[in-house]
């Protein structure tokens, strides 16, 4: 077996796995801010983020999609735009000034980045 530490292109997530991870990401974005007792506007922002991620995830071409019409290459580009928006949310005063909200935002951003970076976008098994 090839040594995984020497493989600079190690991408263990298939598009199907990425799709499932996106659903979990959306659930976390929709629920965790409420559990953290975040500001009502912050909760609403993350509910909108969650809805968007769920929507384009459910429409992307992977095994667990509800209606697979969006190619995964386009999905990747939407992910990158979405993650840019989440990064910018760190500067929003109601998030920046609340340690729990800021920590959640940075964790969500980190998880999203890892999910995108570890996905084998060229895997056409779906």
Which positions does each model-derived feature cover?
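Short amphipathic, positively biased membrane-proximal segments
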Residues: 1-126
């Amino acid at each position: 077996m090839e040594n995984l530490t020497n493989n600079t292109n190690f991408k263990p997530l298939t598009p199907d796995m990425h799709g499932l991870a996106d659903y979990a990401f959306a659930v976390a974005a929709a629920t965790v801010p409420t559990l953290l007792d975040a500001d009502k506007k912050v909760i609403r922002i993350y509910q909108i983020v969650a809805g968007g991620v769920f929507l384009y995830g459910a429409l992307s071409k992977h095994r667990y999609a509800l209606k697979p019409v969006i190619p995964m290459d386009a999905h990747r580009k939407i992910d990158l735009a979405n993650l840019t928006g989440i990064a910018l949310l760190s500067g929003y005063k109601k998030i920046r000034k609340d340690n729990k909200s800021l920590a959640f935002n940075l964790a969500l951003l980190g998880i999203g980045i890892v999910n995108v970076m570890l996905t084998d976008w060229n895997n056409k098994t779906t």
